[in-house]
Amino acid sequence: VCTYLRSNVALMKKMIEEGYQDPETLQGRIDAVNEWLKDPKLLEADANAEYAAVIEIDLSEITEPILACPNDPDDVKLLSDIQGTPIQDIFLGSCMTNIGHFRAAAEIWRGEKFNPNVRTWVCPPTRMDQDKLKEEAVFSVFSAMGARLEIAGCSLCMGNQARVPDGVNMFSTSTRNFDDRIGNGAQVYLGSAELGAVTSTMGKLPTPAEYLAVYKEKVAPKKDEI
């Protein structure tokens, strides 16, 4: 939470620097967030709170990626259940991504060959992230992979700037995969940026072993930098 809030503070400061029309309001938010960050406390339920249900998940038992399947965000399956599914389009973007996701994808793609059978779309959520990625030369990796570089914003997540061809299988890092949202008849799988990057190079959903091998080799050693 603190990491995201610090990122938001940086964004608001940049907006003020670029001439935002109501700087006092933004500065007030900046001050309030910074004050909370000095002693961060999350909301807690009352001791006598009653719950409709309690769900406990042992994260140590989750040993592979979980994806939302076409075309329902609630229809989730393990990667091993759908491995090998051919994918024609990859979308790395939406407001659920942050700059670290793009850095991780670039590490996975670095040194890989362009896959002509996959259309890869890259769209940072904010111009601040977009500019930073350009400064870090991350965009050059995307270009080498033949990615379509979208203007920062929604892009394919809403299907309002562009759409994929009819009936394709697609992997997206967005949060919604409702029927025809991104393309007519498109079958959309939702998952992480790292898994999307591996899928882009292979043209299909990898096996858990294939994915983890790439992640451990290319991403894990640089997790502190990413």
List where the protein language model places each region.
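Fe-S-dependent hydro-lyases/dehydratases of central metabolism
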Residues: 1-226
